[in-house]
Design a protein with these regions (language model features):
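Active-site region of glycoside hydrolase catalytic domains
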Residues: 1-42, 66, 85-86, 95-368, ...
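Active-site mouth loops of central-metabolism enzymes
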Residues: 43-56
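Catalytic domains of carbohydrate-active enzymes, especially glycoside hydrolases
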Residues: 57-78, 290, 294
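The short coil/loop that forms the "turn" connecting the two helices of the helix-turn-helix
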Residues: 70, 492, 541-542
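Terminal helix-turn-helix DNA-binding modules in bacterial transcription factors
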Residues: 470-475, 480, 484, 503-542, ...
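Core residues of bacterial helix-turn-helix
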Residues: 489-490, 497, 501, 539-540
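Key DNA-contact positions within bacterial/archaeal DNA-binding proteins
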Residues: 495, 545, 560
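Short hydrophobic/aromatic patch on the recognition helix
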Residues: 497, 501, 546-547, 551
Length: 588
Protein backbone atom coordinates (compact mmCIF):
# COMPACT_ATOMS: atom_id res chain seq x y z
CA UNK A 1 0.00 0.00 0.00
CA UNK A 2 1.27 3.45 -0.90
CA UNK A 3 0.06 5.42 2.12
CA UNK A 4 3.03 7.43 3.38
CA UNK A 5 4.01 6.83 6.99
CA UNK A 6 2.72 10.25 8.05
CA UNK A 7 -0.63 9.78 6.32
CA UNK A 8 -3.37 11.26 8.52
CA UNK A 9 -6.07 8.72 9.37
CA UNK A 10 -8.99 10.44 10.99
CA UNK A 11 -12.72 10.77 11.44
CA UNK A 12 -14.86 13.88 11.50
CA UNK A 13 -17.98 15.39 13.04
CA UNK A 14 -19.32 18.92 13.49
CA UNK A 15 -20.52 20.97 16.43
CA UNK A 16 -24.23 21.25 15.71
CA UNK A 17 -24.48 17.65 14.59
CA UNK A 18 -23.15 16.11 17.82
CA UNK A 19 -22.69 18.58 20.68
CA UNK A 20 -26.24 19.25 21.90
CA UNK A 21 -26.25 21.64 24.90
CA UNK A 22 -27.80 24.12 22.53
CA UNK A 23 -28.36 26.84 25.13
CA UNK A 24 -25.98 25.85 27.92
CA UNK A 25 -23.19 27.78 29.55
CA UNK A 26 -24.05 31.02 27.79
CA UNK A 27 -24.23 29.76 24.22
CA UNK A 28 -26.16 31.99 21.83
CA UNK A 29 -28.61 30.57 19.29
CA UNK A 30 -27.53 29.67 15.79
CA UNK A 31 -29.57 29.75 12.60
CA UNK A 32 -29.86 25.96 12.96
CA UNK A 33 -31.34 26.30 16.45
CA UNK A 34 -34.01 28.53 14.94
CA UNK A 35 -34.49 26.63 11.69
CA UNK A 36 -35.10 23.30 13.42
CA UNK A 37 -38.02 24.92 15.22
CA UNK A 38 -39.75 25.73 11.94
CA UNK A 39 -42.47 23.12 11.38
CA UNK A 40 -41.94 20.88 8.37
CA UNK A 41 -38.30 21.71 7.84
CA UNK A 42 -36.66 18.71 9.50
CA UNK A 43 -37.55 15.05 9.20
CA UNK A 44 -39.92 14.11 12.04
CA UNK A 45 -39.27 17.49 13.66
CA UNK A 46 -35.86 16.47 15.02
CA UNK A 47 -33.48 19.07 16.42
CA UNK A 48 -29.85 19.21 17.48
CA UNK A 49 -30.82 20.33 21.00
CA UNK A 50 -29.28 17.23 22.55
CA UNK A 51 -27.87 15.41 19.52
CA UNK A 52 -25.16 13.03 20.80
CA UNK A 53 -24.71 15.06 23.99
CA UNK A 54 -21.04 15.23 23.08
CA UNK A 55 -20.75 18.52 24.99
CA UNK A 56 -21.09 16.52 28.22
CA UNK A 57 -19.66 13.23 27.06
CA UNK A 58 -16.61 14.46 25.19
CA UNK A 59 -14.15 12.70 27.53
CA UNK A 60 -15.72 9.30 26.99
CA UNK A 61 -16.01 10.01 23.28
CA UNK A 62 -12.33 10.86 23.01
CA UNK A 63 -11.42 7.74 24.99
CA UNK A 64 -13.50 5.74 22.54
CA UNK A 65 -11.73 7.38 19.57
CA UNK A 66 -8.39 6.45 21.13
CA UNK A 67 -9.53 2.86 21.69
CA UNK A 68 -10.45 2.63 18.05
CA UNK A 69 -7.00 3.84 17.07
CA UNK A 70 -7.90 7.20 15.53
CA UNK A 71 -4.90 9.41 14.76
CA UNK A 72 -6.81 12.61 14.01
CA UNK A 73 -10.22 14.05 14.74
CA UNK A 74 -11.84 16.81 12.72
CA UNK A 75 -14.13 18.86 14.93
CA UNK A 76 -15.84 22.19 14.37
CA UNK A 77 -16.21 25.13 16.70
CA UNK A 78 -19.69 26.50 17.22
CA UNK A 79 -19.40 30.21 16.52
CA UNK A 80 -22.35 31.23 18.77
CA UNK A 81 -21.05 29.05 21.60
CA UNK A 82 -17.90 31.15 21.61
CA UNK A 83 -19.45 34.48 20.64
CA UNK A 84 -23.14 34.34 21.68
CA UNK A 85 -23.94 37.44 19.64
CA UNK A 86 -21.64 36.42 16.82
CA UNK A 87 -19.42 39.43 17.47
CA UNK A 88 -18.17 41.26 20.56
CA UNK A 89 -18.54 39.51 23.89
CA UNK A 90 -16.61 36.26 24.28
CA UNK A 91 -18.29 33.44 26.18
CA UNK A 92 -15.39 32.00 28.14
CA UNK A 93 -17.29 28.90 29.18
CA UNK A 94 -18.00 28.07 25.56
CA UNK A 95 -14.42 28.60 24.50
CA UNK A 96 -13.33 26.56 27.45
CA UNK A 97 -15.18 23.53 26.09
CA UNK A 98 -12.96 23.46 23.00
CA UNK A 99 -9.91 24.09 25.14
CA UNK A 100 -10.71 20.97 27.19
CA UNK A 101 -11.63 18.97 24.12
CA UNK A 102 -8.30 19.77 22.47
CA UNK A 103 -6.41 18.85 25.66
CA UNK A 104 -8.30 15.61 25.90
CA UNK A 105 -7.52 14.72 22.29
CA UNK A 106 -3.85 15.51 22.67
CA UNK A 107 -3.61 13.53 25.89
CA UNK A 108 -4.66 10.54 23.78
CA UNK A 109 -2.32 11.47 20.92
CA UNK A 110 -5.15 12.35 18.58
CA UNK A 111 -4.42 15.36 16.34
CA UNK A 112 -7.20 17.96 16.43
CA UNK A 113 -8.17 19.39 13.03
CA UNK A 114 -10.39 22.37 13.69
CA UNK A 115 -13.04 23.60 11.27
CA UNK A 116 -14.07 27.17 11.96
CA UNK A 117 -17.41 27.23 10.17
CA UNK A 118 -19.55 24.14 9.80
CA UNK A 119 -22.87 25.90 9.18
CA UNK A 120 -24.11 26.93 12.66
CA UNK A 121 -24.14 30.66 11.92
CA UNK A 122 -24.89 32.97 14.88
CA UNK A 123 -28.56 33.94 14.82
CA UNK A 124 -27.74 37.46 16.05
CA UNK A 125 -25.61 38.04 12.95
CA UNK A 126 -28.21 36.46 10.72
CA UNK A 127 -30.56 39.21 11.91
CA UNK A 128 -27.96 41.66 10.61
CA UNK A 129 -28.00 40.09 7.17
CA UNK A 130 -25.81 37.03 7.65
CA UNK A 131 -23.48 36.27 4.76
CA UNK A 132 -25.30 38.90 2.70
CA UNK A 133 -23.82 41.60 4.88
CA UNK A 134 -20.47 42.85 3.48
CA UNK A 135 -19.31 43.04 7.11
CA UNK A 136 -19.61 39.26 7.48
CA UNK A 137 -15.95 38.53 6.53
CA UNK A 138 -14.82 40.82 9.35
CA UNK A 139 -17.12 39.10 11.84
CA UNK A 140 -15.71 35.76 10.83
CA UNK A 141 -12.12 37.00 11.03
CA UNK A 142 -12.73 38.26 14.58
CA UNK A 143 -14.26 34.96 15.62
CA UNK A 144 -11.28 33.18 14.06
CA UNK A 145 -8.86 35.36 16.03
CA UNK A 146 -10.59 34.48 19.29
CA UNK A 147 -10.44 30.74 18.60
CA UNK A 148 -6.90 30.77 17.24
CA UNK A 149 -5.59 32.84 20.15
CA UNK A 150 -6.97 30.24 22.54
CA UNK A 151 -6.16 27.00 20.77
CA UNK A 152 -3.22 27.54 18.43
CA UNK A 153 -0.57 26.73 21.01
CA UNK A 154 -1.87 23.14 20.54
CA UNK A 155 -3.83 23.14 17.29
CA UNK A 156 -1.87 23.18 14.05
CA UNK A 157 -4.47 22.17 11.46
CA UNK A 158 -7.27 24.52 10.51
CA UNK A 159 -10.13 24.35 8.03
CA UNK A 160 -11.86 27.65 7.35
CA UNK A 161 -15.23 26.95 5.71
CA UNK A 162 -17.04 23.68 5.35
CA UNK A 163 -18.62 23.21 1.92
CA UNK A 164 -19.67 26.67 0.74
CA UNK A 165 -21.58 24.93 -2.07
CA UNK A 166 -23.89 23.48 0.59
CA UNK A 167 -24.44 26.33 2.95
CA UNK A 168 -25.04 28.69 0.05
CA UNK A 169 -26.85 26.22 -2.25
CA UNK A 170 -29.06 24.58 0.36
CA UNK A 171 -29.20 27.40 2.92
CA UNK A 172 -29.82 30.28 0.52
CA UNK A 173 -30.78 28.64 -2.76
CA UNK A 174 -33.43 25.98 -2.23
CA UNK A 175 -34.18 26.65 1.42
CA UNK A 176 -33.60 23.09 2.61
CA UNK A 177 -31.02 24.16 5.17
CA UNK A 178 -30.81 27.03 7.63
CA UNK A 179 -31.54 29.84 7.32
CA UNK A 180 -34.02 28.46 4.78
CA UNK A 181 -33.81 31.19 2.16
CA UNK A 182 -34.75 30.81 -1.46
CA UNK A 183 -32.77 33.66 -2.87
CA UNK A 184 -32.17 34.31 -6.51
CA UNK A 185 -28.81 33.43 -8.00
CA UNK A 186 -27.50 36.99 -7.75
CA UNK A 187 -28.06 37.19 -3.98
CA UNK A 188 -26.84 33.65 -3.43
CA UNK A 189 -23.58 34.35 -5.24
CA UNK A 190 -23.16 37.62 -3.36
CA UNK A 191 -23.46 35.75 -0.05
CA UNK A 192 -21.00 33.22 -1.45
CA UNK A 193 -18.59 36.00 -2.42
CA UNK A 194 -18.64 37.31 1.14
CA UNK A 195 -18.06 33.80 2.45
CA UNK A 196 -15.02 33.52 0.17
CA UNK A 197 -13.65 36.80 1.49
CA UNK A 198 -14.31 35.47 5.00
CA UNK A 199 -12.24 32.41 4.10
CA UNK A 200 -9.29 34.61 3.04
CA UNK A 201 -9.61 36.83 6.11
CA UNK A 202 -9.67 33.78 8.34
CA UNK A 203 -6.40 32.56 6.82
CA UNK A 204 -4.86 35.98 7.48
CA UNK A 205 -6.14 35.84 11.06
CA UNK A 206 -4.75 32.35 11.62
CA UNK A 207 -1.36 33.27 10.17
CA UNK A 208 -1.12 36.40 12.31
CA UNK A 209 -2.41 34.92 15.58
CA UNK A 210 -1.17 31.36 15.49
CA UNK A 211 1.43 30.50 18.09
CA UNK A 212 3.00 27.94 15.79
CA UNK A 213 3.26 27.49 12.02
CA UNK A 214 -0.22 26.49 10.92
CA UNK A 215 -1.49 24.17 8.20
CA UNK A 216 -4.59 25.72 6.68
CA UNK A 217 -7.09 24.46 4.16
CA UNK A 218 -10.79 24.43 3.48
CA UNK A 219 -13.37 21.82 2.65
CA UNK A 220 -15.10 21.94 -0.70
CA UNK A 221 -17.95 19.74 -1.99
CA UNK A 222 -18.51 20.48 -5.62
CA UNK A 223 -19.21 17.05 -7.07
CA UNK A 224 -17.09 14.51 -8.92
CA UNK A 225 -17.75 13.06 -12.35
CA UNK A 226 -15.81 10.02 -13.41
CA UNK A 227 -15.37 8.39 -16.83
CA UNK A 228 -17.70 5.52 -17.70
CA UNK A 229 -14.83 3.85 -19.59
CA UNK A 230 -11.09 4.40 -19.74
CA UNK A 231 -11.25 5.91 -23.22
CA UNK A 232 -9.42 9.27 -23.54
CA UNK A 233 -12.70 10.83 -24.72
CA UNK A 234 -14.61 9.70 -21.63
CA UNK A 235 -11.78 10.80 -19.34
CA UNK A 236 -11.82 14.22 -20.97
CA UNK A 237 -15.61 14.34 -20.57
CA UNK A 238 -15.32 13.52 -16.86
CA UNK A 239 -12.64 16.17 -16.34
CA UNK A 240 -14.76 18.73 -18.11
CA UNK A 241 -17.89 17.86 -16.12
CA UNK A 242 -15.99 17.98 -12.80
CA UNK A 243 -14.46 21.37 -13.53
CA UNK A 244 -17.39 23.06 -15.27
CA UNK A 245 -19.69 25.71 -13.86
CA UNK A 246 -23.40 25.20 -14.55
CA UNK A 247 -25.54 28.32 -14.84
CA UNK A 248 -28.53 26.95 -12.95
CA UNK A 249 -26.79 25.98 -9.68
CA UNK A 250 -23.86 26.58 -7.40
CA UNK A 251 -22.92 22.87 -7.39
CA UNK A 252 -19.52 22.98 -8.97
CA UNK A 253 -15.89 23.08 -7.98
CA UNK A 254 -14.29 25.80 -10.03
CA UNK A 255 -16.49 28.78 -9.14
CA UNK A 256 -15.42 28.33 -5.53
CA UNK A 257 -11.90 26.99 -5.85
CA UNK A 258 -10.47 29.08 -8.70
CA UNK A 259 -10.78 32.33 -6.72
CA UNK A 260 -9.35 30.71 -3.63
CA UNK A 261 -6.32 29.31 -5.45
CA UNK A 262 -5.90 31.53 -8.54
CA UNK A 263 -7.43 34.78 -7.31
CA UNK A 264 -10.10 35.04 -10.01
CA UNK A 265 -13.48 33.55 -10.82
CA UNK A 266 -13.34 31.18 -13.81
CA UNK A 267 -14.19 32.77 -17.16
CA UNK A 268 -16.65 29.99 -17.84
CA UNK A 269 -18.43 30.77 -14.55
CA UNK A 270 -18.61 34.49 -15.24
CA UNK A 271 -20.17 33.65 -18.59
CA UNK A 272 -22.56 31.09 -17.09
CA UNK A 273 -23.83 33.36 -14.30
CA UNK A 274 -23.71 36.54 -16.38
CA UNK A 275 -25.52 39.37 -14.60
CA UNK A 276 -25.94 37.26 -11.47
CA UNK A 277 -22.16 37.14 -10.86
CA UNK A 278 -21.05 39.39 -8.00
CA UNK A 279 -19.15 42.63 -8.53
CA UNK A 280 -15.71 42.34 -6.97
CA UNK A 281 -12.57 44.36 -6.51
CA UNK A 282 -8.97 43.32 -7.06
CA UNK A 283 -8.33 43.84 -3.35
CA UNK A 284 -11.11 41.39 -2.47
CA UNK A 285 -9.75 38.79 -4.86
CA UNK A 286 -6.35 39.18 -3.28
CA UNK A 287 -7.81 38.45 0.14
CA UNK A 288 -9.79 35.50 -1.19
CA UNK A 289 -6.65 33.96 -2.64
CA UNK A 290 -4.56 34.25 0.51
CA UNK A 291 -2.43 31.13 0.11
CA UNK A 292 -3.55 27.98 1.87
CA UNK A 293 -1.61 24.79 2.49
CA UNK A 294 -3.96 22.02 1.44
CA UNK A 295 -7.06 21.48 -0.59
CA UNK A 296 -9.69 19.70 1.48
CA UNK A 297 -12.76 18.17 -0.09
CA UNK A 298 -15.52 15.84 0.86
CA UNK A 299 -16.36 13.12 -1.64
CA UNK A 300 -19.23 10.76 -0.98
CA UNK A 301 -20.04 9.62 -4.50
CA UNK A 302 -19.56 10.51 -8.14
CA UNK A 303 -21.52 10.46 -11.35
CA UNK A 304 -20.38 8.45 -14.37
CA UNK A 305 -20.20 10.34 -17.66
CA UNK A 306 -19.12 9.66 -21.20
CA UNK A 307 -18.48 11.61 -24.35
CA UNK A 308 -21.26 11.45 -26.89
CA UNK A 309 -20.46 10.99 -30.57
CA UNK A 310 -20.81 14.76 -30.99
CA UNK A 311 -18.26 15.31 -28.21
CA UNK A 312 -20.68 16.59 -25.56
CA UNK A 313 -20.76 15.15 -22.03
CA UNK A 314 -23.59 12.77 -21.22
CA UNK A 315 -24.47 11.05 -17.98
CA UNK A 316 -23.92 7.29 -18.13
CA UNK A 317 -26.77 5.86 -16.10
CA UNK A 318 -25.99 3.00 -13.76
CA UNK A 319 -27.91 -0.18 -14.53
CA UNK A 320 -30.89 -0.96 -12.29
CA UNK A 321 -29.78 -2.55 -9.04
CA UNK A 322 -26.53 -0.61 -8.76
CA UNK A 323 -25.67 -0.42 -5.04
CA UNK A 324 -26.60 2.77 -3.21
CA UNK A 325 -26.64 4.09 0.32
CA UNK A 326 -29.65 4.88 2.49
CA UNK A 327 -29.41 8.41 1.06
CA UNK A 328 -29.74 6.82 -2.39
CA UNK A 329 -26.23 8.03 -3.19
CA UNK A 330 -24.66 5.56 -5.60
CA UNK A 331 -21.72 3.44 -4.56
CA UNK A 332 -19.02 4.76 -6.89
CA UNK A 333 -15.55 4.22 -5.39
CA UNK A 334 -13.74 5.45 -8.50
CA UNK A 335 -14.82 8.97 -7.51
CA UNK A 336 -12.08 8.75 -4.88
CA UNK A 337 -9.54 8.22 -7.62
CA UNK A 338 -10.74 10.66 -10.27
CA UNK A 339 -11.77 13.46 -7.91
CA UNK A 340 -8.34 13.88 -6.29
CA UNK A 341 -6.71 13.50 -9.71
CA UNK A 342 -8.76 16.21 -11.41
CA UNK A 343 -8.53 18.55 -8.41
CA UNK A 344 -4.76 18.17 -8.15
CA UNK A 345 -4.28 18.67 -11.88
CA UNK A 346 -6.09 21.99 -11.63
CA UNK A 347 -5.24 23.42 -8.22
CA UNK A 348 -1.92 21.69 -7.58
CA UNK A 349 -2.24 21.63 -3.81
CA UNK A 350 -1.78 18.70 -1.42
CA UNK A 351 -5.17 17.05 -0.92
CA UNK A 352 -7.00 16.00 2.20
CA UNK A 353 -10.23 14.04 2.03
CA UNK A 354 -12.13 15.90 4.73
CA UNK A 355 -15.19 13.61 4.54
CA UNK A 356 -16.07 10.24 3.02
CA UNK A 357 -18.52 7.70 4.33
CA UNK A 358 -21.99 6.26 3.93
CA UNK A 359 -25.36 6.31 5.56
CA UNK A 360 -26.38 2.71 6.04
CA UNK A 361 -29.98 1.68 6.56
CA UNK A 362 -29.16 -1.53 8.46
CA UNK A 363 -27.19 0.02 11.29
CA UNK A 364 -28.90 -1.28 14.39
CA UNK A 365 -27.66 -3.16 17.41
CA UNK A 366 -28.08 -6.90 16.82
CA UNK A 367 -28.95 -9.61 19.34
CA UNK A 368 -25.25 -10.14 19.93
CA UNK A 369 -24.88 -6.52 21.00
CA UNK A 370 -22.88 -5.52 17.95
CA UNK A 371 -23.62 -3.50 14.84
CA UNK A 372 -22.78 -5.47 11.71
CA UNK A 373 -22.33 -2.85 9.03
CA UNK A 374 -20.60 -4.96 6.41
CA UNK A 375 -21.76 -2.56 3.68
CA UNK A 376 -19.84 0.33 5.25
CA UNK A 377 -16.68 -1.78 5.44
CA UNK A 378 -17.07 -2.62 1.80
CA UNK A 379 -17.86 1.01 0.94
CA UNK A 380 -14.88 2.46 2.78
CA UNK A 381 -12.41 -0.17 1.70
CA UNK A 382 -13.27 0.18 -1.97
CA UNK A 383 -13.16 3.97 -1.67
CA UNK A 384 -9.82 3.85 0.13
CA UNK A 385 -8.36 1.46 -2.42
CA UNK A 386 -9.20 3.96 -5.14
CA UNK A 387 -7.62 6.74 -3.12
CA UNK A 388 -4.57 4.54 -2.73
CA UNK A 389 -4.44 4.13 -6.49
CA UNK A 390 -4.39 7.91 -6.87
CA UNK A 391 -1.55 8.09 -4.33
CA UNK A 392 0.34 5.36 -6.14
CA UNK A 393 0.10 7.35 -9.33
CA UNK A 394 1.58 10.41 -7.65
CA UNK A 395 -1.42 12.39 -6.38
CA UNK A 396 -0.33 14.09 -3.18
CA UNK A 397 -3.03 13.02 -0.71
CA UNK A 398 -2.12 13.78 2.89
CA UNK A 399 -5.06 12.49 4.86
CA UNK A 400 -8.49 10.90 5.01
CA UNK A 401 -11.31 11.64 7.45
CA UNK A 402 -14.17 9.19 7.70
CA UNK A 403 -17.57 10.83 8.00
CA UNK A 404 -18.47 10.37 10.71
CA UNK A 405 -17.00 9.26 14.00
CA UNK A 406 -20.53 8.64 15.30
CA UNK A 407 -24.13 8.73 14.11
CA UNK A 408 -25.44 12.27 14.30
CA UNK A 409 -27.96 14.90 13.29
CA UNK A 410 -28.01 14.91 9.50
CA UNK A 411 -29.39 18.43 9.01
CA UNK A 412 -32.79 18.47 7.24
CA UNK A 413 -32.82 14.66 7.40
CA UNK A 414 -32.73 14.70 11.20
CA UNK A 415 -31.58 11.41 12.70
CA UNK A 416 -32.88 9.40 9.75
CA UNK A 417 -29.37 8.68 8.52
CA UNK A 418 -26.61 6.88 10.32
CA UNK A 419 -23.19 7.83 8.99
CA UNK A 420 -21.22 6.87 12.09
CA UNK A 421 -18.45 4.40 12.69
CA UNK A 422 -20.04 4.29 16.11
CA UNK A 423 -23.74 3.69 16.65
CA UNK A 424 -25.55 6.14 18.93
CA UNK A 425 -28.73 5.20 20.74
CA UNK A 426 -30.26 8.66 21.07
CA UNK A 427 -32.52 7.64 23.96
CA UNK A 428 -29.79 6.33 26.21
CA UNK A 429 -26.79 7.99 24.51
CA UNK A 430 -25.14 4.60 24.54
CA UNK A 431 -22.29 4.31 22.02
CA UNK A 432 -21.65 1.00 20.24
CA UNK A 433 -18.70 0.85 17.88
CA UNK A 434 -19.87 -0.78 14.67
CA UNK A 435 -17.88 -3.53 12.95
CA UNK A 436 -16.56 -0.83 10.61
CA UNK A 437 -15.04 1.05 13.57
CA UNK A 438 -12.92 -1.97 14.53
CA UNK A 439 -12.10 -2.58 10.90
CA UNK A 440 -11.06 1.06 10.43
CA UNK A 441 -8.84 0.69 13.51
CA UNK A 442 -7.08 -2.20 11.75
CA UNK A 443 -6.69 -0.08 8.62
CA UNK A 444 -5.15 2.72 10.67
CA UNK A 445 -2.83 0.46 12.66
CA UNK A 446 -1.58 -1.19 9.48
CA UNK A 447 -1.32 2.19 7.66
CA UNK A 448 -3.71 0.91 5.04
CA UNK A 449 -2.25 -2.59 4.96
CA UNK A 450 -5.51 -4.11 6.15
CA UNK A 451 -7.13 -2.90 2.94
CA UNK A 452 -5.33 -5.77 1.25
CA UNK A 453 -8.10 -7.93 2.60
CA UNK A 454 -10.31 -6.39 0.00
CA UNK A 455 -7.86 -5.71 -2.81
CA UNK A 456 -8.88 -7.72 -5.83
CA UNK A 457 -7.16 -11.06 -6.12
CA UNK A 458 -4.71 -11.56 -8.96
CA UNK A 459 -1.72 -9.75 -7.51
CA UNK A 460 1.24 -11.90 -6.54
CA UNK A 461 1.81 -10.46 -3.11
CA UNK A 462 -0.21 -12.27 -0.47
CA UNK A 463 -2.83 -9.89 0.86
CA UNK A 464 -2.80 -8.58 4.39
CA UNK A 465 -5.37 -11.09 5.57
CA UNK A 466 -3.10 -13.96 4.58
CA UNK A 467 0.07 -12.44 5.98
CA UNK A 468 -1.64 -11.59 9.25
CA UNK A 469 -3.21 -15.04 9.49
CA UNK A 470 0.20 -16.69 9.03
CA UNK A 471 1.79 -14.35 11.51
CA UNK A 472 -0.92 -15.08 14.06
CA UNK A 473 -0.61 -18.84 13.65
CA UNK A 474 3.15 -18.73 14.14
CA UNK A 475 2.95 -16.43 17.13
CA UNK A 476 0.30 -18.47 18.93
CA UNK A 477 1.38 -22.05 18.26
CA UNK A 478 1.19 -23.17 21.85
CA UNK A 479 -2.41 -21.97 22.11
CA UNK A 480 -5.45 -23.85 21.00
CA UNK A 481 -7.33 -21.99 18.31
CA UNK A 482 -9.36 -22.95 15.30
CA UNK A 483 -10.37 -21.28 12.05
CA UNK A 484 -13.34 -19.65 13.72
CA UNK A 485 -11.01 -18.01 16.25
CA UNK A 486 -8.64 -16.91 13.49
CA UNK A 487 -11.53 -15.42 11.52
CA UNK A 488 -12.75 -13.59 14.61
CA UNK A 489 -9.25 -12.16 15.03
CA UNK A 490 -9.25 -11.05 11.40
CA UNK A 491 -12.84 -9.80 11.71
CA UNK A 492 -14.07 -11.76 8.77
CA UNK A 493 -16.16 -14.81 8.13
CA UNK A 494 -14.44 -18.23 8.55
CA UNK A 495 -15.51 -19.29 5.04
CA UNK A 496 -14.13 -16.09 3.56
CA UNK A 497 -10.83 -16.63 5.33
CA UNK A 498 -10.55 -20.27 4.25
CA UNK A 499 -11.41 -19.46 0.65
CA UNK A 500 -8.97 -16.57 0.48
CA UNK A 501 -6.23 -18.62 2.11
CA UNK A 502 -6.65 -21.50 -0.29
CA UNK A 503 -6.73 -19.13 -3.24
CA UNK A 504 -3.49 -17.39 -2.34
CA UNK A 505 -1.46 -20.29 -0.94
CA UNK A 506 -2.99 -23.28 -2.64
CA UNK A 507 -3.19 -24.92 0.78
CA UNK A 508 -6.16 -25.73 2.90
CA UNK A 509 -6.09 -23.48 5.98
CA UNK A 510 -6.72 -26.25 8.51
CA UNK A 511 -4.00 -28.38 6.91
CA UNK A 512 -1.64 -25.39 7.02
CA UNK A 513 -2.27 -24.95 10.75
CA UNK A 514 -1.64 -28.65 11.39
CA UNK A 515 1.58 -28.60 9.35
CA UNK A 516 2.94 -25.61 11.22
CA UNK A 517 2.06 -27.21 14.55
CA UNK A 518 3.78 -30.45 13.58
CA UNK A 519 6.89 -28.62 12.31
CA UNK A 520 7.02 -26.89 15.64
CA UNK A 521 6.61 -30.21 17.48
CA UNK A 522 9.45 -31.75 15.45
CA UNK A 523 11.75 -28.98 16.61
CA UNK A 524 10.67 -29.54 20.20
CA UNK A 525 11.14 -33.30 20.00
CA UNK A 526 14.78 -32.86 19.10
CA UNK A 527 15.15 -32.51 22.82
CA UNK A 528 15.28 -36.20 23.89
CA UNK A 529 14.25 -35.29 27.42
CA UNK A 530 10.98 -33.70 26.34
CA UNK A 531 7.90 -35.78 27.05
CA UNK A 532 5.59 -36.37 24.12
CA UNK A 533 2.68 -35.04 26.18
CA UNK A 534 4.56 -31.78 26.63
CA UNK A 535 5.39 -31.55 22.93
CA UNK A 536 1.70 -32.07 22.19
CA UNK A 537 0.65 -29.34 24.59
CA UNK A 538 3.30 -26.86 23.49
CA UNK A 539 2.26 -27.17 19.88
CA UNK A 540 -1.40 -26.55 20.60
CA UNK A 541 -2.89 -30.07 20.53
CA UNK A 542 -5.66 -30.92 22.95
CA UNK A 543 -4.40 -34.43 23.67
CA UNK A 544 -1.63 -36.85 22.91
CA UNK A 545 -3.75 -39.20 20.83
CA UNK A 546 -4.80 -36.48 18.44
CA UNK A 547 -1.24 -35.18 18.32
CA UNK A 548 0.19 -38.60 17.50
CA UNK A 549 -2.43 -39.21 14.86
CA UNK A 550 -1.74 -35.96 13.04
CA UNK A 551 2.01 -36.38 13.48
CA UNK A 552 1.89 -39.77 11.91
CA UNK A 553 -0.32 -38.69 9.06
CA UNK A 554 1.95 -35.82 8.11
CA UNK A 555 5.38 -37.36 8.73
CA UNK A 556 4.82 -41.11 8.37
CA UNK A 557 6.19 -41.70 11.88
CA UNK A 558 4.88 -41.56 15.43
CA UNK A 559 6.39 -38.84 17.64
CA UNK A 560 8.23 -41.57 19.62
CA UNK A 561 9.75 -43.10 16.48
CA UNK A 562 10.81 -39.65 15.30
CA UNK A 563 12.43 -38.86 18.63
CA UNK A 564 14.28 -42.19 18.68
CA UNK A 565 15.41 -41.90 15.09
CA UNK A 566 16.60 -38.34 15.63
CA UNK A 567 18.64 -39.50 18.62
CA UNK A 568 20.21 -42.38 16.66
CA UNK A 569 21.12 -40.14 13.75
CA UNK A 570 22.55 -37.51 16.02
CA UNK A 571 24.65 -40.06 17.94
CA UNK A 572 25.88 -41.57 14.69
CA UNK A 573 26.95 -38.22 13.33
CA UNK A 574 28.80 -37.49 16.56
CA UNK A 575 30.90 -40.61 16.12
CA UNK A 576 31.59 -40.35 12.40
CA UNK A 577 34.93 -38.63 11.64
CA UNK A 578 34.54 -35.65 9.36
CA UNK A 579 35.60 -36.61 5.86
CA UNK A 580 35.50 -34.32 2.83
CA UNK A 581 32.91 -35.64 0.40
CA UNK A 582 35.10 -35.18 -2.66
CA UNK A 583 38.76 -35.31 -1.63
CA UNK A 584 39.96 -34.41 -5.14
CA UNK A 585 38.16 -31.13 -5.15
CA UNK A 586 39.77 -30.23 -1.79
CA UNK A 587 43.30 -30.76 -3.18
CA UNK A 588 42.73 -29.23 -6.56
C1 LIG B 1 -21.17 16.97 4.38
C2 LIG B 1 -21.37 17.81 5.59
O1 LIG B 1 -20.22 18.54 5.86
C3 LIG B 1 -21.78 17.02 6.82
O2 LIG B 1 -22.19 17.92 7.79
C4 LIG B 1 -22.87 16.04 6.43
O3 LIG B 1 -23.38 15.38 7.54
C5 LIG B 1 -22.29 15.06 5.44
N1 LIG B 1 -21.91 15.80 4.26
C6 LIG B 1 -23.27 13.97 5.01
O4 LIG B 1 -24.32 14.52 4.32
Amino acid sequence: MSFPTNFVWGAAASAYQIEGAWDEDGKGPSTWDMFTRTPGKIWEGHTGNIACDHYHRYKDDVAMMADLGLKAYRLSVSWPRVLPDGAGRVNDKGLDFYDRLVDELLSKEIQPWVTLFHWDFPYALFLRGGWLNPESPKWFAKFTEVVVSKLSDRVKHWITLNEPQCFIGLGMGNGEHAPGFKLDMREGLLAGHHALIAHGRAIEAIRSKSKQPAQIGWSSAGGVYYPATQSPEDIAAARQATLSVYSESVWNNSWWCDPVVFGHYPEEGLRAYGEAAPRFTAAEMKVISTPMDFYGCSIFFGVAVKASSSGSVVIARQPPGHPHSHYLWKHTPTALYWGPRFFTERWKLPMVITENGMSNSGDWVSFDGRVHDAARIEFMSSNLLQLEKALREGVDVRGYFAWSIMDNFEWAEGYKHRFGLVHVDYETQRRTPKDSAYWYGDVIRSNGGALDKFASAGTDAPPYVIKETMRYINAHLSEMFNIKDLAAHMRCHPDFLSRKFKKHTGVDLSLYIRRIRIDHARELLKNPDLLIDDAAEQSGFTDRIHFSKVFRRLTGQTPGQYQRQFRVERDASLHTPLKPKNPRSVHA
